[in-house]
Amino acid sequence: MNDIILTSQKLYKSYHDGTSRVEVLKGVDLAITKGDRIAIIGPSGSGKSTLLHLLGGLDKPTSGLITLGKVDWQKINEKQRCQLRNQQLGFVYQFHHLLPEFTALENVMMPLLLAGMAVKDAEEKAINMLEQVGLKPRLAHKPAQLSGGERQRVAIARALVHQPHCVLADEPTGNLDEATASKVFDLMLELNKKMNTALVIVTHDQRIAERMDRVLVLHEGSLYARE
């Protein structure tokens, strides 16, 4: 039980669409432990990204409990949520969301600087992380000077540079060609194993899902293990 990082209990999320109420999540229970590899699959519009946002404290549930470590997301303010996210979670999206005016190195340094780390220490850690993703020769390049695969590797380095307990990834290879997507995903699995960081991926790609330890299906608001 001590290895549990992130949990949801009886998680509900609904939206109002005009006069009607749309229930996206209906009592979702999930426990994520250290080093987990979890794929979440399901039809488009089933609420996979919504679930990921809730787990990451980027949105609030209609009801239910979400805990990161021993902290209830609902019992802390926005500033505390930001601090907790920066300390314990990493995020990778389909689009890299790198800051275009900054170099690869500066983008990867950003979470460390926001956490109050000294510039020299942040630079050293960021260089090391970029080396691990094979981009040491590209430190000074801005996103526009990098290929799609390279940009996504910078995004992965940024997500992992502070050694989070869990990485939440939403279609991280969705914008890449098949060969590049395979290489990027291989890298994510390698770093997941090396750093013992839990990895939760929302994906439509069955080949990615097949390589994860657990495959969960989100359908009509319910989350269950694929048989």
Curated annotation (Swiss-Prot):
Enzyme class: translocase
EC numbers, comma separated: 7.6.2.-
InterPro entries linked: AAA+_ATPase (IPR003593), ABC_transporter-like_ATP-bd (IPR003439), ABC_transporter-like_CS (IPR017871), ABC_transpr_LolD-like (IPR015854), LolD_lipo_ATP-bd (IPR011924), MacB-like_ATP-bd (IPR017911), P-loop_NTPase (IPR027417)
SMART domains: AAA (SM00382)
GO MF entries: ATP binding; ATP hydrolysis activity; transmembrane transporter activity
Gene Ontology biological process terms from the UniProt entry: lipoprotein localization to outer membrane; protein localization to outer membrane
Annotated SUPFAM superfamilies: P-loop containing nucleoside triphosphate hydrolases
Every ABC transporter domain range: 6-227
Pfam families (alphabetical): ABC_tran
PROSITE patterns to which the protein is assigned, alphabetical: ABC_TRANSPORTER_1 (PS00211), ABC_TRANSPORTER_2 (PS50893), LOLD (PS51244)
Record keywords, A-Z: ATP-binding, Cell inner membrane, Cell membrane, Membrane, Nucleotide-binding, Translocase, Transport
Intracellular or extracellular location(s): Cell inner membrane
Residues reported in the UniProt entry to bind ATP: G42, P43, S44, G45, S46, G47, K48, S49
Topological category with respect to the lipid bilayer: Peripheral membrane protein
Top-level taxon in the UniProt lineage: Bacteria
Family annotation (CDD domains): ABC_MJ0796_LolCDE_FtsE
Transmembrane parts of this sequence: none
Gene Ontology terms: cellular component: plasma membrane
Gene3D superfamilies named in the record: P-loop containing nucleotide triphosphate hydrolases
Subunit: The complex is composed of two ATP-binding proteins (LolD) and two transmembrane proteins (LolC and LolE).
PANTHER family for the chain: IMPORT ATP-BINDING PROTEIN (PTHR24220), LIPOPROTEIN-RELEASING SYSTEM ATP-BINDING PROTEIN LOLD (PTHR24220:SF689)
Described purpose of this protein according to its UniProt entry: Part of the ABC transporter complex LolCDE involved in the translocation of mature outer membrane-directed lipoproteins, from the inner membrane to the periplasmic chaperone, LolA. Responsible for the formation of the LolA-lipoprotein complex in an ATP-dependent manner.
UniProt similarity note: Belongs to the ABC transporter superfamily. Lipoprotein translocase (TC 3.A.1.125) family.
The protein's name: Lipoprotein-releasing system ATP-binding protein LolD
Source species of the chain: Legionella pneumophila (strain Paris)
Classification of source organism: Bacteria, Pseudomonadati, Pseudomonadota, Gammaproteobacteria, Legionellales
